[in-house]
């Protein structure tokens, strides 16, 4: 993957990134990522339902309560609050149903076609299709998608302003493949052990939000990455 390799030479990489919920399915990893602790109802990539959901506080709710915008963009979807054309297990915002989460689903889960580089929310989480994320297609396809889509962000006026952090990571493996890209990001590999909850803490710190559960005791990646 030549384009991703070129990015890796220009940004921060964490060499010892462990899954927060080792051995769990994708949906569990994603939901835990956004709420900061293990979820015991979202199991085996089940579809969102009364028996497969989370009522815990989460980054989307935190941002909304603070007057910020947080959006999960879903490639392949054509309508809001839908994972049609994609895999629901990779769309974490669909699983949060506590407080007023469900009432805000349409604003927090948007088709990727609505992703506008010049009008970004405070936090954007992009879910590529199962082909473009490498699950069903080759690394060549993945690299081409990243070159087109991430490349557009990195070449934008918004990114040039110096206030945008771009992250690329996978939901499983050890070490978890990851890249942290920003105008201020350090270059090279960081040996400090981290987890997905460390990333949640970075997001919260960057947005001026408090920590949640497991993120409170996790290593903050922000000073390590220079972002």
Name each model feature, range by range.
Residues 1-227:
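Flexible, surface-exposed loop/gating regions in the mature catalytic domains
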């Amino acid at each position: 993957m030549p384009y991703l390799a070129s990015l890796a030479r220009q940004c921060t990489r964490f060499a010892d990134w462990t899954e927060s919920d080792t051995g769990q399915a994708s949906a569990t990893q994603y939901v835990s990522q956004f709420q900061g602790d293990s979820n015991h109802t979202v199991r085996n990539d089940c579809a969102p339902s009364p028996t497969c959901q989370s009522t815990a506080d989460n980054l989307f709710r935190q941002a909304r309560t603070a007057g910020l915008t947080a959006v999960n963009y879903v490639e392949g979807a054509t309508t809001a609050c839908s994972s049609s054309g994609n895999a629901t297990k990779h769309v974490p915002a669909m699983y949060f149903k506590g407080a007023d989460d469900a009432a805000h689903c349409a604003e927090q889960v948007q088709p990727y076609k609505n992703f506008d580089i010049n009008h970004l929310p405070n936090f954007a989480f992009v879910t590529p299709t199962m082909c473009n994320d490498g699950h069903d297609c080759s690394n060549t396809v993945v690299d081409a998608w990243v070159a087109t889509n991430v490349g557009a962000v990195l070449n934008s006026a918004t990114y040039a302003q110096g206030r945008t952090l771009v992250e690329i990571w996978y939901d499983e493996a050890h070490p978890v493949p990851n890249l942290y890209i920003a105008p201020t990001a350090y270059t090279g590999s960081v040996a400090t052990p981290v987890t997905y909850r460390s990333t949640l803490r970075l997001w919260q710190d960057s947005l001026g939000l408090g920590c949640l559960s497991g993120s409170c005791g996790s290593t903050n990646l922000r000073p390590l990455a220079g972002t």
